[in-house]
Amino acid sequence: MPTITEDCIDGFQQYYSRPPERPKKKSLKQMVYDSEDNSYFGRSMDSWAKIGIFYVAFYGVLAALVAICMWAFFQTLDPRIPKWTLDRSLIGTNPGLGFRPLPPVDNVESTLIWYKGTQHENYKHWTDSLDDFLAVYKVPGLTPGRGQNIYNCDYNQPPPKGQVCDVDIKTWSPCTKENNYSYHKSAPCIFLKLNKIYGWIPEYYNRSNDLPANMPASLKTYIAEVEKTQPEKLNTIWVSCEGENPADQENIGAVNYLPIRGFPGYFYPYQNSEGYLSPLVAVHFQRPKRGIIINVECRAWARNIIHDRKERIGSVHYELLID
């Protein structure tokens, strides 16, 4: 058993002993290459070789697994046919209706078309916007595959498989670029398009004695006239544009639809064929009242298009204000 004296001596020696020697600091050059143990960054060449082989093998196998998984995934996809369509897709089976021109990008949430017909600079945004939107319809080369796939369709002459119907821009007059889309006459043209839904087949209102009660009277009369004179055109998705409220209906004035009052049925179903462009309807407001906001609602009419003003289903809303 140690004595008190021995304990004191041990404590004294421990307290006053020389601290352990620390390794000398290495210079940057020695950190890169240490000639004493022939190492690079603290590892020998053999150690670096083993680490390199491990990571090359690890990431090589990982990349191969990812490539195999991606290859298997893409085998389930078709570049032209969506995996999920109609009821199984997020888009659903009720196409929406869109309009052009749109307000400036800094006011993207607005639906107001407001300008002065007597000032070119004031309505220039709207006509330029239509120029940009309609460019693909005027120059087939802007749409891949359109130049060689165009087919002159008709109601009795649908497009063959792999070809697309031509959109005849000559039938839009006076809603043309050369005529400033009639904006300078305070009688603007608004273009309507139906959103594309792959595989959707419209169910037409093609009998004048079987039309919905809420269809505008003017459209009912139009369908009855088509039934008498051009029955082959009854397979059409009809279009109507009216004032939303009684005051709007009074102020909207006469409305003309070009080339016809709807989207021809031979453009459907949409099959994502190369070069396809959606058909358009030019809505020409011939005499809208100036100096007052006119709320306009346009609807697309087919048996399988549902309308809901609150949800904007099957219809589109915008306002006109011409000073």
UniProtKB/Swiss-Prot annotation:
Parts of the chain that traverse the membrane: 51-71
Keywords: Cell membrane, Disulfide bond, Glycoprotein, Ion transport, Membrane, Potassium, Potassium transport, Signal-anchor, Sodium, Sodium transport, Sodium/potassium transport, Transmembrane, Transmembrane helix, Transport
Record's bilayer topology term: Single-pass type II membrane protein
Tissue expression summary: In embryos, it is expressed in the neurons of the CNS and PNS, in Garland cells and posterior spiracles. In adults, it shows a nervous system specific distribution: optic lobes, brain, thoracic ganglia and axonal pathways in the leg. Both isoforms concentrate in the adult head, isoform 2.2 being predominant. Both isoforms are weakly expressed in the thorax and very poorly expressed in the abdomen.
Biological processes annotated in GO: cell adhesion involved in heart morphogenesis; establishment of glial blood-brain barrier; intracellular potassium ion homeostasis; intracellular sodium ion homeostasis; monoatomic cation transport; open tracheal system development; potassium ion import across plasma membrane; regulation of tube diameter, open tracheal system
Keyword Cell membrane among UniProt keywords: yes
Cytoplasmic face residues: 1-50
Disulfide bridges in this chain: 153-165, 175-189, 241-298
Residues bearing carbohydrate: 180, 206
Residue ranges, Extracellular side: 72-323
Compartment(s) where it occurs, according to its Swiss-Prot or TrEMBL record: Cell membrane
Principal subcellular localisation of the protein: membrane
Origin superkingdom: Eukaryota
Alphabetical list of Gene3D superfamilies matching this protein: Na, k-atpase alpha subunit (2.60.40.1660)
A Pfam family hit: Na_K-ATPase
GO molecular function: ATPase activator activity
GO cellular component, one term: septate junction
Subunit structure: The sodium/potassium-transporting ATPase is composed of a catalytic alpha subunit, an auxiliary non-catalytic beta subunit and an additional regulatory subunit.
Family label: Belongs to the X(+)/potassium ATPases subunit beta family.
Function: This is the non-catalytic component of the active enzyme, which catalyzes the hydrolysis of ATP coupled with the exchange of Na(+) and K(+) ions across the plasma membrane. The beta subunit regulates, through assembly of alpha/beta heterodimers, the number of sodium pumps transported to the plasma membrane.
The name this protein goes by in its record: Sodium/potassium-transporting ATPase subunit beta-2
Organism: Drosophila melanogaster
GN (gene name): nrv2
